[in-house]
């Protein structure tokens, strides 16, 4: 049967899919719009699976903290392109992930990505045409202290901080903003993992100015440079980004507080993004269209 333009329009509005895809779905069901939607939903799993090997290295991070500062969550949700990361449907999905993580006090992706969430994700993949993924979730509980957060204006960096023994929401936000800007590795120098320190020592030993020097001189120089490395990469030792005359540790101590822990998410960090030139991308699309013909 011929499919009317009004049916195609209605299916597009209800699914957000393209005109040709909607027309084909309606033709296959003889104009039964509910059956067409059901078939499209069944197909979404296949479509999502086909896109799963594409690198999702863009996206946004988001945070939500309880009004009383008792706990908070961070999430990172990835897309393939920055364009989709600004899409209203994608951002609505991110909001639903944050709300689910917050209400469930989720500490990992598994606690968020239940059957309903996965179904929503797959439907979004079908609608948008890109791989979408919930990459990570972080939970920090105050344990009698205070949790605060900062999300940078571009939604690409988010930080959560746990304070103890005092402080305020404003202080926690300031410390979180500093962490977003400076990216320390640990809270205190003694928190630095031994393997990181040993790796840094190997790097220092290999530097040209160490060659040929007596062992005691080398050790003295090594100690000085390791201490400098620890100071530069430990939150409490860093000059506060809003007032470099004071360290973050001194700032927090002034309010009778201390930093217990922090969590920092930056979109795409650690993901190796596949680079393709435009010609190769077009060729791949042409090949795919021939394969589907």
Curated annotation (Swiss-Prot):
Gene Ontology CC terms, in alphabetical order: cytoplasm
Pfam families registered for this protein in UniProt: EF_TS
PROSITE patterns: EF_TS_1, EF_TS_2
Keywords tagged on the record: Cytoplasm, Elongation factor, Protein biosynthesis
Spans annotated as Involved in Mg(2+) ion dislocation from EF-Tu: 81-84
GO molecular function annotations of the record: translation elongation factor activity
CDD domains: UBA_EF-Ts
Alphabetized SUPFAM superfamilies for the sequence: Elongation factor Ts (EF-Ts), dimerisation domain, UBA-like
Keyword Protein biosynthesis tagged: yes
Subcellular location: Cytoplasm
InterPro entries: EF-Ts_dimer_sf, Transl_elong_EFTs/EF1B, Transl_elong_EFTs/EF1B_dimer, Transl_elong_Ts_CS, UBA-like_sf
Keyword Thylakoid annotated: no
Primary localization: cytoplasm
Family designation: Belongs to the EF-Ts family.
PANTHER family, sorted: ELONGATION FACTOR TS, ELONGATION FACTOR TS, MITOCHONDRIAL
Function as written in the Swiss-Prot or TrEMBL entry: Associates with the EF-Tu.GDP complex and induces the exchange of GDP to GTP. It remains bound to the aminoacyl-tRNA.EF-Tu.GTP complex up to the GTP hydrolysis stage on the ribosome.
Protein name per Swiss-Prot or TrEMBL: Elongation factor Ts
Organism (species): Teredinibacter turnerae (strain ATCC 39867 / T7901)
Encoding gene per record: tsf
